[in-house]
Amino acid sequence: MESHVVHNAQKPHVVCVPYPAQGHINPMLKVAKLLYAKGFHVTFVNTLYNHNRLLRSRGPNALDGFPSFRFESIPDGLPETDGDRTQHTPTVCMSIEKNCLAPFKEILRRINDKDDVPPVSCIVSDGVMSFTLDAAEELGVPEVIFWTNSACGFMTILHFYLFIEKGLSPFKDESYMSKEHLDTVIDWIPSMKNLRLKDIPSYIRTTNPDNIMLNFLIREVERSKRASAIILNTFDELEHDVIQSMQSILPPVYSIGPLHLLVKEEINEASEIGQMGLNLWREEMECLDWLDTKTPNSVLFVNFGCITVMSAKQLEEFAWGLAASRKEFLWVIRPNLVVGEAMVVLPQEFLAETIDRRMLASWCPQEKVLSHPAIGGFLTHCGWNSTLESLAGGVPMICWPCFSEQPTNCKFCCDEWGVGIEIGKDVKREEVETVVRELMDGEKGKKLREKAEEWRRLAEEATRYKHGSSVMNLETLIHKVFLENLR
């Protein structure tokens, strides 16, 4: 059902600015689609590098948009020869911080000079694209900051400055990376219990006081306090206490997720806006046909997201562990998944042995996969989009966190939400085999699946009904923040 809450003659005009990585572009596009469905004119701003990459992956007309949904691009300041720059987060963040404000202000000026487009009335920006706040303040329009992390992950980042004040980061030397030190209890972050240093986002685990990401994130969360509001892709029932604790230290915080479920309720998938996608890789839809031939809960889905990389040895251990489990699996293997390799090569013996019980893909429609009845478990890096989509699909997880706030998400999946089993960072095929069997067939797996089903039901209630928490939060956000200037 498409609904519109805006009826005034002058449409509100929102400019959406995602961070240029797949895991940030997708949720921002969902926010843009929801606002479009509510009657907003939308301008979606990619970096020029990703704009061109999207044209290559989705076709020359992919970004034509339509009258009330337009695409623009700004340069990211990096040399054209920089290869796949989405893999170099610190470099991208620093370049954006230094180079993007002027071209962004020029886009806003150009939009506001047009007679056939309503003037910009609000901006939604990714949490790490806060240069846009300067432009919003200069223009006199509200800005909403969208942090694409979990609430628990964002809450830990909000307290990075205290790790420095308490002498917990940066580490004095490499010996502080030991298991013993990483088991240090962290009991002073509001609403977050039983945390250890190892559960905190990886950026604090540095010996360099000038670490780019640690200092960049401290600056960005501080700048977020200038926003009119903050939105999170989560739902109140899942992270209620943490969200409540944030309200006292930040502008109003609105949880409006899971966004993919909200979009499903608000937008007809067959419509023009429903069909619009911004995947940097081509999705292999054959995955769904293969899953259609499988029995319920019989297939393990394996995907480590769009940025995570591993060694060739880790890849091999995962492969042989999956083979030994004798379970059917769908494994997404990006060409750049292995560090230093342009293409992933799996052992021929592995390919031959598993040919009748696996499908390999370079990218897939993950939301659809995780809601498919054949999927019985998910081996994941615990990126937030993946974690939330798994919860929304009622799918339990094997957690292999790598960086950023993935360790925090893993901790909550395993200990707070009751839907995950953690697997060791030093991947061993025997452990992979054991954990896969336990998740798919064991008693623990059964309990995790029951708990995941509870979260699936609560996620649906938050997004499907008029009084669902995320439905109401989105309506409040629109009327109290986005439309406030137009009254």
Swiss-Prot record:
Its EC number is 2.4.1.-. The keyword Coiled coil does not apply. Expressed in roots, shoots, leaves and flowers. Keywords: Glycosyltransferase, Transferase. UDP-alpha-D-glucose binds at residues 364-366, 381-389, 403-406. It is an enzyme of class 2 (transferase). InterPro entries: UDP_glucos_trans, UDP_glycos_trans_CS. It comes from the Eukaryota. SUPFAM superfamilies: UDP-Glycosyltransferase/glycogen phosphorylase. GO terms for cellular component: cytosol. GO terms for molecular function: glucuronosyltransferase activity; UDP-glucosyltransferase activity. Belongs to the UDP-glycosyltransferase family. This is UDP-glycosyltransferase 85A7. The lineage of its organism: Eukaryota, Viridiplantae, Streptophyta, Embryophyta, Tracheophyta. The gene is UGT85A7.
